[in-house]
């Protein structure tokens, strides 16, 4: 990409403070699934009811291991002449190997789309500015628009934003060149902050095979079908649901810490004069005002005003954000 040097690393901003911004999603990647059996094959692999996915939809689900634990989250949509999903770059090669395990028995090809460009567009007046760049924009009711060389995805949470998926650098470079004098250019950490704010679970390599989908907010987001047929891990996911034995949940924590914690670090909760372990960090970003956002999966047997910290950080103080994640409305998503 010609303009890659424009995307500087800066402390992130909350969605309500974000100016018009273009974000290079270098920490995400794309896997393409093509071939005659692509729908049938993915139907047996992920938590989504794949045959119900329309051309103008995208949906977040999970690919699980046989124990029902998440190998990766997948943002699934139709792309070019097949299906594709966005996942974290740290998981791309592991995910490719897992998906290919049984592909020899099906007419399907699965590959990492190495040359694909992922650009996030967010912030103030995003739709107004993009109207001058694209003939048609996606909406909340039609969240994917396809053209010959690209697909454009719409997100309504935490505020309206877009994701450009281009099969070649030229579309991304064209957009950047056109917006160079209007936009702020940021690294992928800003998109990560927006995903934390939205309650979209961030599963990286350090946390794969640790959590069931319900613990990662995917049921609330409509990312698990309980009516489709079998898929890898389905028995465990269904049994957990119907027995009500899931004891963990996804939380958005805000506060301060001596440093930005690493993915997979432990969190502790204050219990009178002491602390005990309660969960693990999925993602964390430092904001421009010096505060810290942490996405974590925690045991949910505690008061919502509890004080937490990164393990061993004596001066740290984190609390559950007062802003709730957007919850799934069954009528709005027919494919889960």
Swiss-Prot record:
Predominant place of localization: cytoplasm
UniProt entry tagged with the keyword Cytoplasm: yes
Sequence intervals crossing the membrane: none
List of residues binding folate: 28, 191
Function: Folate-binding protein involved in regulating the level of ATP-DnaA and in the modification of some tRNAs. It is probably a key factor in regulatory networks that act via tRNA modification, such as initiation of chromosomal replication.
HAMAP family associated with the record: tRNA_modifying_YgfZ
Stated name of the protein: tRNA-modifying protein YgfZ
Species name: Hamiltonella defensa subsp. Acyrthosiphon pisum (strain 5AT)
């Amino acid at each position: 990409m010609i303009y890659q040097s424009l995307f500087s690393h800066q402390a992130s901003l909350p969605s309500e403070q974000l100016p018009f911004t273009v974000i290079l999603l270098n920490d995400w990647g794309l896997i393409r699934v093509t071939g005659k059996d692509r729908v049938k094959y993915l139907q047996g692999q992920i938590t989504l009811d794949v045959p119900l996915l329309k051309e103008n939809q995208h949906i977040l689900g999970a690919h699980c291991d046989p124990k029902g634990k998440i190998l990766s989250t997948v943002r699934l949509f139709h792309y070019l002449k097949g299906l594709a999903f966005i996942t974290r770059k740290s998981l791309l090669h592991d995910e490719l190997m897992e998906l290919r395990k049984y592909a020899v028995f099906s007419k399907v090809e699965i590959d990492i789309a190495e040359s694909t460009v992922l650009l996030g567009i967010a912030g103030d007046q995003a739709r107004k500015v993009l109207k001058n760049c694209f003939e048609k924009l996606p909406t909340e009711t039609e969240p994917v628009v396809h053209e010959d060389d690209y697909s454009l995805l719409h997100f309504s949470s935490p505020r309206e934003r877009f994701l450009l998926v281009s099969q070649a650098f030229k579309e991304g470079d064209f957009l950047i060149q056109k917006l160079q004098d209007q936009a702020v250019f940021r690294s992928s950490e800003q998109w990560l902050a927006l995903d934390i704010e939205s309650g979209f679970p961030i599963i990286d390599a350090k946390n794969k095979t640790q959590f069931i989908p319900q613990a990662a907010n995917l049921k609330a987001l409509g990312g698990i079908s309980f009516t489709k047929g079998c898929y890898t891990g389905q028995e465990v996911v269904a049994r957990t649901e119907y027995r009500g034995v899931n004891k963990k949940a996804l939380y958005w924590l805000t506060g301060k810490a001596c440093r930005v914690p690493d993915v997979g670090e432990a969190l502790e909760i204050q219990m009178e004069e002491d602390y005990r372990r309660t969960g693990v960090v999925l993602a964390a970003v430092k904001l421009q005002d010096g505060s810290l956002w942490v996405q974590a999966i925690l045991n949910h047997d505690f008061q919502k005003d509890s004080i937490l910290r990164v393990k061993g950080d004596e001066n740290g103080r984190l609390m559950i954000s007062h802003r709730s994640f957007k919850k799934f409305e069954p009528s709005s998503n027919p494919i889960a």
